[in-house]
Amino acid sequence: MESRMDQYEIMEQVGRGAFGAAILVNHKIERKKYVLKKIRLARQTERCRKSAHQEMALIARLQHPYIVEFKEAWVEKGCYVCIVTGYCEGGDMDELMKKLNGTYFPEEKLLKWFAQLVLAVDYLHSNYVLHRDLKCSNIFLTKDQDIRLGDFGLAKTLKEDDLTSSVVGTPNYMCPELLTDIPYGFKSDIWSLGCCMYEMAAHRPAFKAFDMAGLISKINRSSIGPLPACYSSSMKTLIKSMLRKSPEHRPTASEILKNPYLQPYVNQCRPLSDAPTPIRMPEKPLSTSRSNQRCTSESQSSSISCSDIDSTQSSDRSTSGGAPSTDSKLNDIRSIQDADRADSDEKCVTPEDLRGNKNISGAELKRQDSSKSVHQHHRGESKQPKIIEKIMTTLREESRLRENNSPVSSSGVKLTSAVSNKNQAEQSSESSRPHSGVSYSSKFGDISSNGWTNTSDECVDPVQVPLQLKQLSPTVEHCPKLKNSGSSTPEPAKQIAENGSSASGMSKTKSSPSSSRRPSPQRQTVAGIPIVPFTVSKRAHIKAESEKTPPRPAHSPNNSLHNLPPLIPISTNLSEENIKLGNSQAMPAPLEFVTAASKEDISFYSNSVVDCVEKAEPSEVFESNSPAYLTPPWTGPVLDAKGENGLIAIPCSEIHTGTLQKSMASNDDSSLSSPLDTFYLSFEQEFVCKDDSQSSKHGHSAVTLLSGEDKFTVQELLASTPVISPFVSSTSNTLPEDKSSYQSFKKQSDSHSGPPVDVPAQTIRLNSFLVSDEWPTSETVQGEARDTAASKLLNVVREDFDVRSSSCSTSTQPSGQTPVRSKLNVPETNLASNISIPSISEAVRLSTAMDVKPYTSEASNGVKEEASPAKEALDVTSFRQRAEALEGLLELSADLLENNRLEELAIVLQPFGKNKVSPRETAIWLARSFKGMMNEEGGRLSM
């Protein structure tokens, strides 16, 4: 049988989109150029396959002067979807703007294009089609510079006044209601059209930021820059009216066409579209083709469109040539249906989707959330971090999903909680967890890696749905996923429940098998304060899981903690606490603990071990194969962020500011300053480990908190004295078998007492030399926040890889050893820590081991940095990361040149050059290291 491809002569590839290649072809008989969009189904995920079929069927029934011309479509050999559209010689709008190099379009031309675009969008909306991916790279130009709107790969058919909720499109063009997970409708296309018109006028995106958090913030505030002064105020007002935050305040496409300022251009363009051009509906196979199209398009893309990867290239290019006859297109559609039936198994689509039963149409998949619309605006702010995580994760996982080619199994309903932990995220394909008000279809949704289940839904004619299809159809009840639920079982403030209702307040959420199997940590309390273990997992374990861990609030409404990973107890008010000690010592500052344990085994990396810290206070810190437990022998009222508890609970599955921020008692950024300040401080001061009876010198660990990428690494700094077992021991014998109480624990710890030893502390420096295998970023040191009472800056200790390996070996101890407890009498000159980071409101100066006096630092006046988004993996192709690296290198080079430090400047610039391969991580590492040294020298000179 002769293939339809034989009718075309392949000329060249003109673009590559999200789902396939765009090839310029020449029709052998017509001698006319077309664009062939060829999508190989075998290499696509189920989502991409459905999108290909949806685009093929949808564009076949669209006919408008300002929409790409449809020639024909078919399934080639059961494994390719071929869509032939007209070729646009003028390219796309994005390419044209780049060629102009900053020269603005005349206002008359912009308004003409605007009128053509609005006419096309009005045609789509009047036929209940939502484009969902309006952007400049999808606006094509003919040889006569007329508009053709294309790329319907994400389009969706909606019932009138209906809404959808799938997160699709290009982030810069997404509307606020989509980003806040509020169901959206046709007004989302109006927002995207406003973004396009702004970009066409200003030659820059309406909303642009270096990270997703900044972009979403600008979109939610509708914060746009001024348009060029060469345009009239009427045009500016028209563009801004489409970029209003509330969908109700945006005009519809038909209302824009009635705008008096645009009327002359609409009348000029309307003669081409005066004749009514309804959507083409074949007579005989009406129910078959439409049910086929709608059923195959029920599951629209529920992740970010990949078409913005190659936004300057497109697979939809068209001209205004004549369309084939209705009979030929009827045959095309029939052939498409036949091929779909023959290859239904190859495409991994249900038979109901492809066979087009006459009593079942896409109208039957009725949405359950159409009544829940913009009244849910109150959920927006609390859901924003999860939306950020969702968008960033789906962007990263898009290519991986296509490569794996693993459609979601239809054997059972798969649900994941929006606030599942990383173990739950790993087993999301196996667990089945009820969610109040939400039912997902495993056949029509993709489960993203961060535990969020995306579904796509469609609202069309209300027809009775058979039970079999109802089980497959996605229905989403949009309930606030972060609402406070009073139905959680209250617990005493002294205990932390490992299993129970999650801190997000979602009622009736079962724990996954992984969390139910995990042993509960020991619960110990002293003076009504819960003590929580803190473990730092090895980087190798965290690397693949950190992106999967969604943010979670730490406190439930009844002020108890539920279902939390290992946490750090941190006192929050160092200068106001009234410490009452039972051993009649002078009043020291409250202790702070940092300990680390390997999660899977006792093998430590040198950058994943943190020694126990106690300031002038007898205590015992130990760990076993289970998470470590910390018990402070002090009492006194302590205020947390809400003034109720003495702890700030910080999950440690990935230690960075983004996770810390999201795991506090509130999702509100304004409540983070006090608890986070103290948390930073606990890592950036030098600590002393002391006991009444025995002391020994051991390796100190400096934890450097980096504000740039919001991550920290740990350096093992070893003393020159004989090697002694580290303070953090891996023995399981020190853990009480019955996990009883603090008294039994302290009684056991007192059995290891010995004679005290006075040793000088080894001074350490918080620097930028990192042991981590991930690329570093510089920490911000504010000179004005340094305390003049401190004697000097901490000295530089630089470890080579031999020392790191030895520290790694010494940090790993065989089981059966008891922890070593030390007493350090350290001179004030070596202990004064005067390093201050922005957002730190308090600092602690350690005067002696017996007399530690807290004081309030001047750092509260420092500039508070905006919370950074969740940590991203190293990506040398990321424009934001490359921009930050370039800025740091330029700043460093300028400083070196100004100080006439040419040798160091030569070292910094050595990896760069025409004939050199310059690994960015190496160059950045050098830049941060030298910059940190310069900051230290500047601090010494200023004293």
UniProtKB/Swiss-Prot annotation:
What is the role of the protein in this entry?
A: May be involved in plant development processes.
The residue ranges flagged as biased composition, category Basic and acidic residues, are: 329-356, 379-403
What CDD domains does the annotation carry? STKc_Nek (cd08215)
Location of the active site: D133 (proton acceptor)
Where are the compositionally biased (Low complexity) regions?
A: 295-315, 500-519, 805-819
Q: Which SUPFAM superfamilies match?
A: Protein kinase-like (PK-like)
Does the keyword rRNA processing feature in the UniProt annotation? no
EC top class, as a word: transferase
What SMART domains has UniProt attached to this entry? S_TKc
Report residues binding ATP: V14, G15, R16, G17, A18, F19, G20, A21, A22, K37
Instruction: Name the family the entry cites.
Output: Belongs to the protein kinase superfamily. NEK Ser/Thr protein kinase family. NIMA subfamily.
Give GO MF terms, alphabetically: ATP binding; protein serine kinase activity; protein serine/threonine kinase activity
- Native organism is Oryza sativa subsp. japonica
- Its EC number is 2.7.11.1
Name of the molecule in the record: Serine/threonine-protein kinase Nek4
Listed A to Z, the keywords are: ATP-binding, Kinase, Nucleotide-binding, Serine/threonine-protein kinase, Transferase
